[in-house]
């Protein structure tokens, strides 16, 4: 493209949903002829997509804005922290514009005002799958915005609004475009994947000569037709989650669920405004494992929530022992500006919160290590993410990018594996987080057209 094209620097912070917002803005910028540059110095203007979920994210976002202001001086701010424009303008009154999450039009208007486009969108084309910030072989697929829940520790609804589902045919067409562009793994994200379509009354829409409901199970059935890995994130533990487990058992959907349980004490869950039937949760986890023995269940928890007693923390540790989850993330509770949990009595001292967090993670590390050790001697289908010298770094079907473990393929160089390759790996060793093994030689031309037809041993 011409050197005269206006140049935009872009900083993307926050969760995968925010990453999708960034990708949509970047796609529109490229469609309109803007060059995306990797440095502040080379940019005519900088867009910062912020996060504002917890205090540390607010600090990171403000720091990023400040860095861009100091290095460039022309900065447009968007994203979740943009819902608090007074906080941004108090710190940096010279920012050009501030807008909230998924407000793509406002971002583009601000860019146009600061840097008019010099491009005819009918001449230069952008790939129909858009601009991606992830590696080419995987992509996040956002199916909705907002959330109807009012968890006491969370301010997402005040930032992103109530649930607004995308029509199922629109989502499936986007997934098709991504697969045409080389994506081999789709990561379904939202604030509440289980609630998908409830706001649209599960309306039916046509795709590929068939009618699909705007509902989680129907969406999964459609995605399974694309022949790539499909992974579900941010699933709320509703009973109808049971309906998608057979798709996992049949190899049509990755046997993986990311479900944030948050705690195991009924009283704490009630204070969090989360479902509190812990016995039913345990029964459901065991039922999923019976229906699909290969299933991986990942979850997140909050330790040290206001009022959490020693006994309630011990109940949380007992839950880990009983549930035998594969992957777990945990956070020590920290107040979030605007969250109703801030007003709860009996805050847990910071030192005690950190002590409990360490004990919690140590207990789960033992469980995860044992579950990974049990995979030694098995063959796992893996997707290569990175080549480091002679070792290929990959992920198994049990591992989402960034948050889960890795599979280190020792003979990756010998077999000339490439990023994006799907390969069967014999597992020879493990630790608390990762697996190690050797790829089995295969003729790429002989691989089945549907990646999900390969089953783990």
Swiss-Prot record:
Domain TRAM as annotated: residue spans: 373-441
* InterPro entries for the chain: Elp3/MiaA/NifB-like_rSAM, Methylthiotransferase, Methylthiotransferase_CS, Methylthiotransferase_N, Methylthiotransferase_N_sf, NA-bd_OB-fold, Ribosomal_uS12_MeSTrfase_RimO, rSAM
Molecular-function GO terms, alphabetical: 4 iron, 4 sulfur cluster binding; aspartic acid methylthiotransferase activity; metal ion binding; protein methylthiotransferase activity
In which residues is [4Fe-4S] cluster 1 bound? 15, 51, 80
Binding positions ([4Fe-4S] cluster 2) = 147, 151, 154
Class in the EC hierarchy, top level = transferase
Keywords tagged on the record: 4Fe-4S, Cytoplasm, Iron, Iron-sulfur, Metal-binding, S-adenosyl-L-methionine, Transferase
Q: What catalytic activity is recorded?
A: L-aspartate(89)-[ribosomal protein uS12]-hydrogen + (sulfur carrier)-SH + AH2 + 2 S-adenosyl-L-methionine = 3-methylsulfanyl-L-aspartate(89)-[ribosomal protein uS12]-hydrogen + (sulfur carrier)-H + 5'-deoxyadenosine + L-methionine + A + S-adenosyl-L-homocysteine + 2 H(+)
Q: Which SUPFAM superfamilies match?
A: Radical SAM enzymes
Similarity section = Belongs to the methylthiotransferase family. RimO subfamily.
* General function of this protein: Catalyzes the methylthiolation of an aspartic acid residue of ribosomal protein uS12.
- Name it: Ribosomal protein uS12 methylthiotransferase RimO
Source organism per UniProt: Xanthomonas campestris pv. campestris (strain B100)
């Amino acid at each position: 493209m011409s050197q005269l094209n206006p140049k935009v620097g872009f900083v993307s912070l926050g969760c995968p949903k925010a990453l999708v917002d960034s990708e949509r803005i970047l796609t529109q910028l490229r469609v309109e002829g803007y060059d995306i540059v990797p440095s502040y110095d080379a940019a005519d203007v900088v867009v910062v997509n912020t996060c504002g979920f917890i205090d540390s994210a607010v600090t990171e976002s403000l720091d990023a804005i400040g860095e861009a202001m100091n290095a460039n001086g022309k900065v447009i701010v968007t994203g979740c922290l943009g819902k608090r424009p007074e906080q941004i303008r108090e710190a940096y009154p010279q920012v050009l514009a501030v807008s909230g999450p998924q407000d793509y039009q406002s971002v583009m208007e601000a860019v146009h005002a600061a840097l008019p486009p010099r491009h005819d969108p009918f001449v230069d084309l952008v790939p129909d799958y858009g601009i991606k910030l992830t590696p080419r072989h995987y992509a996040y697929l956002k199916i909705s915005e907002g959330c109807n829940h009012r968890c006491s520790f969370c301010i997402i609804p005040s930032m992103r609004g109530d649930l607004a589902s995308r029509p199922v045919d629109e989502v499936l067409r986007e997934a098709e475009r991504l697969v045409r562009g080389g994506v081999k793994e789709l990561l379904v994200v939202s604030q509440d994947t289980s609630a998908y379509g409830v706001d649209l009354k599960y309306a039916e829409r046509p795709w590929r000569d068939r009618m699909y409901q705007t509902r989680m199970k129907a969406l999964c059935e459609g995605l399974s037709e694309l022949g790539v890995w499909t992974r579900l994130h941010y699933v709320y533990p509703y009973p109808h989650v049971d309906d998608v487990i057979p798709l996992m058992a049949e190899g049509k959907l990755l046997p993986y669920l990311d479900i944030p349980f948050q705690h195991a004490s009924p009283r704490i869950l009630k204070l969090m405004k989360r479902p509190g039937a812990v016995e039913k949760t345990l029964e459901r986890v065991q039922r999923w494992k019976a229906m699909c023995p290969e299933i991986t269940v990942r979850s997140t928890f909050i330790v040290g929530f206001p009022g959490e007693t020693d006994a309630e923390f011990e109940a949380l540790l007992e839950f880990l022992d009983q549930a035998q989850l594969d992957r777990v993330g945990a956070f020590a509770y920290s107040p979030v500006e605007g969250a109703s949990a801030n007003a709860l009595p009996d805050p847990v001292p910071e030192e005690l919160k950190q002590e409990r967090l360490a004990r919690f993670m140590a207990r789960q590390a033992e469980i995860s290590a044992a579950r990974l050790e049990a995979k030694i001697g098995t063959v796992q289908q893996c997707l290569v993410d990175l080549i480091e010298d002679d070792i290929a770094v990959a992920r198994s079907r049990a591992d989402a990018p960034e948050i889960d473990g890795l599979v280190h393929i020792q003979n990756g160089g010998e077999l000339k594996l490439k990023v994006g390759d799907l390969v069967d790996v014999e597992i020879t060793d493990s630790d608390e987080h990762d697996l190690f093994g050797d790829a089995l030689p295969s003729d790429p031309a002989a691989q089945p057209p549907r990646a999900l037809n390969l089953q783990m041993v």
